[in-house]
Amino acid sequence: MIGFRNGRTLMMNLGGAAALLPDAPVRPLGAPGEAEVGAALLGRVVDGAGNPIDGLGPIRGAGHWPLAGRIQSPLDRGRVLAPMDVGVRAINGLLTVGQGQRVGIMAGSGVGKSVLLGMMVRAARADVVVIGLIGERSREVADFLETKVAGEARARAVVVAVPANHSPVLRIRGALRATAIAEAFRAEGKKVLLIIDSLTRVAHAGREIGLALGEPASACGYPPSAIAMLPNLIERAGSDVHTGGSITAIYTVLADGDDGNDPVVDSARSILDGHIVLSRAMAERAVYPAIDISKSVSRVMNDIVPRDHQQAARALRQHLATYEENRDLVLMGAYRAGSDAAIDAAIAYHPAIMEFVRQDTDQIVPLEDAAAELTGVFGDAPDGTHG
């Protein structure tokens, strides 16, 4: 059911074409709006309707949770006070993520988004990882499962896969289902990492439904309802003060045409507690993960890392910003050493900074090691000064 008009209920198929007639009777089957949840789903892959698609048979012993979540008071949400180790040096060191934080990965196509997600799935120190693959190509879903969610990572993961050829209703339900599964684990006191790839595809599904209902299109063709549903989805993540559990959520956001002002990008940036921007220029220079440090931010980092870590991260950002501002002068040979101490320091530290950001896909760098390596970038000058 997607809406009402002139005393009639408007409905949309969950699957393909069906032999329906006008005024045909409609009978509900099963409990409406509930998701199967719990430990029975660990290691399993389900579709947007909750049906297992991994060939491992039916899921037995699962509990139930409302797809739309349970209403919580804002006072039931805890503050973000502890870091979440994701195993990626640049994120742990410069964009530290907290338990219960909501983070967006903003990226165009082909800049290493899926690879970065795979690194975090394997390395994150979480009790459970819930992954919603929404609106992706079927081939990419299979590839992600076989290469990014394998071995030990698969045993603690639940995957909800709804490819692009499924109905928009199922794509939205897939995101709701993944979030409901994460909420149920949080209610058990678990530390959950929730990954939705991608939030943009969820908005696209909302756009299809909204336009089918006759809603007026606004920016980039999105009707108001498509953007308005994003806060409801994102706000369900966070910490629970009663159980001690948390949902640390990572949402990928596709910057169509590398447009940072896309309505979905703008909306997500205003709601989320931080964003990680992947740069095509960095990817073209073979720097992976291609994180644009100067355009990325974690809004809770200063609350969860010690002061010396904060100072080293701030110094690295300053040197990187100075280098990027004067990059053309340096590359053309127009800058003369000794003209400006800040530029001299930025040039001296730049190779070490780029080496800090680079990381092999199969390498795991714990939070403690990332903090130590960050300070080591500056040698004997932990504040980033260059003598």
Regions found by a protein language model. Give the residues of each.
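Acidic-enriched and Gly/Ser
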Residues: 1-86
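P-loop NTPase catalytic core
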Residues: 93-94, 100-387
